[in-house]
Regions:
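A contiguous strand-loop segment
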Residues: 31, 40-43, 47-50, 55-64, ...
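An acidic, Gly/Ser/Thr/Pro-rich helix-cap/linker signature
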Residues: 26-119
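C-terminal soluble interaction/assembly domains
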Residues: 249-252, 256-350
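Ligand-binding pocket segment of bilobal, Venus flytrap-like solute-binding proteins
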Residues: 213-273, 279
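Acidic/His-rich structured neighborhood in mature extracellular/periplasmic domains
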Residues: 85-228, 232, 242
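Sec/Tat signal peptide C-region and signal peptidase I cleavage site
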Residues: 21-25
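Bacterial N-terminal signal peptides that target proteins for export
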Residues: 1-9
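Bacterial N-terminal signal peptides
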Residues: 9-18
């Protein structure tokens, strides 16, 4: 009798172990690259040194670096879900974020004002992106940027893109903008309080205080100036706002038929495909569009000042006329929800 029981227990234990090991194997995430990681790093080192990275910087950056399974899993299994406009805005333009933002803007008023004066982007928009990206610097990411980018470049899903970002990250270390131990960011390699990728860092990061470092992690002047410089280089107009919520005429379907796009959207298609054609404010006025309070639209006669209509929740939701500055925000993140979140948050941070 005891022999039979022992055999049953043993068989059951084997089944459990088989199931558990199978589940672990199924859940295990490994890089999709047949080349050993050490060989891949050696090839990368040759390329990096050829691009001006010193051996000492490379060795320090890659000390104890191995592929990060968590990063691979996050990259391969990013959640796909549909979030409504109202859910998105209620979470990202919450009263808590507004209250915290007003406090942060007050605490950093001198730095924000100095950046606005020099670069020409209003403080509230700098703060809007700062708040949306990292909750005003509250969380910038705790991943080793070199480890994350090396993992993603080695994984071969988007090797060209992430290899260029990795080489850019090494250049950041080479130029001394930050030390290896403090080089932290998101799992995808976005860095600092404005969440710049390395290539964006070199295109837009700004050394505002002249200390030869573009410190987008801890230097608030550099943080604000870098965000502002990004917007300015994407066409920001310092004497304009982002747009406005508007009231549409009763025949919304008829209006949309007149103003919908029929041509091909060339840039930021994911967001701009949902926009109308661009018209002047007098043209929108003639089509029956009014301010949200029912008043006439501003009497702007500049022919270069145009606006496009977007209804992020469909014709039964809010409608917005968006100006050129809205497109500058879209260049930061090509999402109407994101750009409206920044815009509406900025309105609360005046």
């Amino acid at each position: 009798m005891s022999i039979v029981i022992t055999r049953i227990i043993l068989t059951f234990s084997i089944l459990i172990m088989s199931f558990t090991n199978g589940a672990i194997a199924k859940d295990r995430v490994v890089p999709d690259n047949p080349q050993p990681f050490e060989e891949w790093v050696a090839d990368l080192k040759t390329e990096a040194l050829g691009k001006g990275i010193s051996e000492s910087v490379f060795e320090a950056a890659f000390q104890d670096i191995t592929p990060d399974p968590k990063v691979i899993k996050l990259d391969r299994h990013q959640p796909e879900f549909t979030q409504t406009y109202f859910d998105y805005i209620s979470k990202r333009v919450s009263q808590t974020r507004i209250k915290n933002g007003l406090k942060k803007v007050a605490e950093n008023a001198d730095d924000l004002a100095a950046v606005e004066d020099k670069i020409g982007v209003q403080q509230r928009f700098i703060a809007g992106i700062w708040g949306m990206e990292t909750n005003y610097g509250g969380y910038t990411g705790g991943y080793n940027v070199i480890k994350s980018l090396a993992t993603l470049a080695y994984d071969m899903r988007r090797p060209t893109y992430f290899r260029s970002q990795l080489l850019g990250a090494l250049k950041i270390l080479e130029e001394g903008h930050i030390t290896p131990e403090n080089f932290k960011g998101s799992w995808a390699g976005a860095m600092g309080q404005g969440q710049f990728m390395p290539t964006s860092f070199f295109a837009y990061a700004y050394d505002f205080d002249g200390d030869a470092k573009k410190d987008i992690w801890t230097n608030q002047k550099d943080v604000y100036a870098s965000i502002a410089n990004y917007l300015k280089k994407h066409g920001w107009e310092s004497n304009r706002t982002w747009g406005r919520q508007v009231r549409l005429p009763q025949d919304i379907d008829g209006l949309w038929e007149k103003v919908k796009q029929t041509g091909k959207v060339k840039s930021c298609r994911r967001a701009l495909k949902d926009h109308s054609i661009q018209l002047s404010l007098p043209e929108w006025q003639a089509l029956g569009v009014r301010t949200i309070y029912g008043a006439d639209l501003p009497k702007v006669t500049d022919p270069d000042f145009t606006a496009s209509l977007v209804m992020p929740a469909g014709k039964d939701g809010p409608a917005f006329l968006t100006y050129k500055n809205f497109r500058a925000i879209l260049s930061y993140n090509c999402s109407n929800y994101y750009a409206l979140g920044v815009s509406l948050l900025s309105d609360e941070l005046k």
